[in-house]
């Protein structure tokens, strides 16, 4: 536990390496607070839809947003639950984005393949009895749109984002299956 705070500080400061440094933070919020439990509705024990996300403080230089949701507490290492890109720089990502490669409504975005092997959002679903998991809802603000096909991988997305991140923010939600 005593190593967690320095690690988080290092990770946030280290984000400058992806974007060339100097990017500002955006505030990300939802129906749950930072370090609070995610309502079951947004998990495999509910209807498994993405929660709404509110993003405050987006730069006027923003061309698009990227969302990456992952669980670093997964038994086999960090598990990716959702990747989406080419989202217009809007302040609200609505709940229940369709699980398809290219989405036009309720908001435009392109989605990639998560670690369940599916396109779109699949919510928290930690192994029963594995304890509390931390789900990181990361929002990257880019100075460009990305030329990636629907269904691309997280690795392809991260490579395409290099040098284009101008802002970053995240919200951490908790979930446990007993």
UniProtKB/Swiss-Prot annotation:
The keyword 4Fe-4S does not apply. Disulfide bonds: none annotated. Keywords: Signal. Belongs to the UPF0098 family. This is UPF0098 protein PYRAB11530. Gene3D superfamilies: PEBP-like. InterPro entries: PEBP, PEBP-like_sf, YbhB_YbcL/LppC-like.
